Amino acid sequence: MARYKGLSILSLFAVFSSLASAELDCSNIKVDGVMWNFGKLGGAHSISETASSHEGYNTTYTLDICKPLTKTLCKKGAFVCAVRNATDINGIERTMDVIDIAGNFVLNSGRTLDPIFTRLKKEDPKTEGLKMELHGGKHKFGNLLKRQKAVITLLCDRERTGLEGLESPKPDGDKKKDGEKKDDDKKDNKDKEGKSKRDGEENKRSLIFKSYNEEEGTLDLEWKTKYACENVEDGGSAPSGHWGFFTWVIVLYVVLVSLPLLSERVTNVRCHSQPVPVHFGLSDIRLVAQLQPVWSSRVGLASSQ
């Protein structure tokens, strides 16, 4: 019996380990009949945020929307990880906190990624893209253990691949600070120049940090990319703009109704010595005229979706 239990535990451990390393099929996401392929956005990408209320602190958010991160301070199975650093008076940066935001943490908390996808056009017809909500993380702030999640809004931008301005994380989860002010910069110009550089970099970057709410445990990111569009090559594919099923039923009905009339007229032509012109009756023309607006509206509706 002990041996059987041992095998069961090993088997369960193997199952949980495989769940922790499970990938997200980012190249085949289907919502409301629309397919998205974000495979080219895969890989670990980082973005940093400096908390204005805590001078000297900065947080680096690293994510991979396709598979678990491999080089990170977060637990195994993390898809989104936050590393909070602080710089001391000697200019040495130290890691102060690590936050597991999203991932498959079956071996730790039993929570999984549980992805939720929402087509943006469903919320706003004028906005094209996909909202990706990833779960699984937990973190203790004070005495409270907060559940974490990442909300990534992938917006359609046909001029961007989505890789513009992205940073590659270091093995420890930190990153190189592009555009960071040097220590010998003048104090009077530091804030002004720093803000100007941040604004310029933000305009160039496709992945943008929006907010992190500690009370709700929610990280909000925005990602501009052509792969969020619904009709780009290797990206999204819009619902078919061809005629729908109901439209084809109407067309088939008209054809079936017209066939007996046409057959009768052809028979009459063969029976008469003099040629008799073949034409549709006035009722047929009226029927087609009445159905024409219906076809037009159906085609227009399909094209707009």
UniProtKB/Swiss-Prot annotation:
Q: Name one GO cellular component term.
A: mitochondrial membrane
Looking at the UniProt entry, the stretches that span the membrane are 243-263
Organism classification: Eukaryota, Fungi, Dikarya, Ascomycota, Pezizomycotina
* Cystines in this chain: C26-C66, C74-C81, C156-C229
Q: Which residues lie on this side of the membrane: Cytoplasmic?
A: 264-305
By what name is this protein known?
A: Autophagy-related protein 27
Residue numbers spanned by region Disordered: 163-202
- Signal peptide region: 1-22
Q: How does it sit in the membrane?
A: Single-pass type I membrane protein; Single-pass membrane protein
UniProt keyword annotation of Glycoprotein present: yes
